[in-house]
């Protein structure tokens, strides 16, 4: 399990150097995570359909996803999760020790992001094409409703135990689906936080 303490502190809203009490809390949360985090990952590679833009016969909606994929000819669909044990432990601590619960939630988020980065790097190492940073449903005008298609095409319930609620939320909560564009000339870094139109997100990274 790989953690990113800098990211954990950012998720906790810590600016500047953390105090000793905060560091001790994060260390406890990292220990908790070691016992309850069980990362799983799955992916599928598809040729990118044009006119209309589509993956696996499913149209992709929105101008932002079209712009993201303009220099791609293939698409990886990916999904990752930390499992239900992490969610159960977070929920338990939120009731019994709220500060630790919040810290564990932040640690798990950073672990999931680091895990996804590692898996995407492995995909890049196994590909002759350039891979773009991942792009998820809900970024820009790429609708969250396409989460249904991601879950269906990846068969996430059977493969990694990830399901979708009627409100389009993934379960377990610490789960992510995304697309990764691939192409010989693929380039661009206008994804992730930069692609999201939300201006008041507390977790939006500072971009220089």
Enumerate the language-model features and the residues they cover.
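Generic secondary-structure signature for well-ordered alpha-helical cores
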Residues: 31-38, 124, 128, 198-201, ...
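Conserved active-site and cofactor/substrate-binding residues in soluble primary-metabolism enzymes
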Residues: 24, 28, 110, 114, ...
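Active-site helix-to-loop segments that bind/position phosphate- or nucleotide-bearing substrates
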Residues: 1-96, 100
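Short terminal or interdomain "cap/linker" segment that borders an active site or interface and mediates
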Residues: 82, 129-205
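Short conserved micro-motifs at the rims of enzyme active sites and ligand-binding pockets
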Residues: 90-91, 205-208
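Feature targets compositionally biased, intrinsically disordered low-complexity regions
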Residues: 12, 125, 180-182
